[in-house]
């Protein structure tokens, strides 16, 4: 490296721009200086800057895919309470989050259970993990996507709109139950399911089991056909647990009903306020009792005077 001819930095910068190597463009001067000082062979220098370019491309790709995925914020596998949903195997979920074979086959994931059981959280968390592992994901409320597809149908662009969704390895349809039992809505949903069958994967969250899907699809034949396509090559999670939101609300209520038993620096003011409130209530009660007693004595005296 020491005997290399002088490099025109401006020319090299232009070349790297043309080659679309922004990380190398930024990093090469520092690594070139280090290579000169430490006597790196040319192959090592090229290897190091190429690795940094690939790492930066991965970072930018994940950033782009996260932006397009529309995932709800804060939903990760680390924050999912697996202990509250014992029927869901954490090991199985982690294997699913890696993607690989099931996405390549166009297999599906179906999550059933009552509202508040963590279906949407788990679906979004799996989606996030898949993006980090190099897959493309889109998360949408089923009603919103169906409305977009209806607009595309009116504009004679339904086939094109469905084809554009092929770029996503996984399409997450959240809250299937809220699609209205309307022929126009359910027909475009069925066409989407049919178009992705064994080609691209779908993940669905729903409050009702398959036996109640006649509330979504008005035509029994369409219901049967949709279920058949979804369950073929599918993994099904039945998350029949108490609502997480309800559990949290009840726990918060219980916590509010438990006053601190001793004062600390942090809660001393709260303890004093509580005690003052109790004192005021006691005084008010005493005054009320005195007033009642006075009124009683007055009535007795009045009767005696008669």
Tell where the protein language model's regions lie, with residue ranges.
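N-terminal nucleic-acid engagement/recognition segments and initiation subdomains in replication
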Residues: 1-40, 290-292, 296-306
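Interdomain "pre-motor" coupling segment immediately N-terminal to P-loop NTPase/helicase cores
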Residues: 13, 17, 21-73
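Conserved phosphate/pyrophosphate-binding and hydrolysis machinery centered on Walker-type P-loop NTPases
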Residues: 2-6, 17-21, 35-43, 70-71, ...
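Short hinge/gating elements
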Residues: 11-14, 30-34, 79, 108-112, ...
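AAA+ P-loop ATPase motor domain of ring mechanoenzymes
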Residues: 47-104, 243-256, 279
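Non-catalytic alpha-helical coupling and interface elements of nucleotide-dependent molecular machines
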Residues: 21, 33, 51-55, 85, ...
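Conserved P-loop
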Residues: 88-167, 216
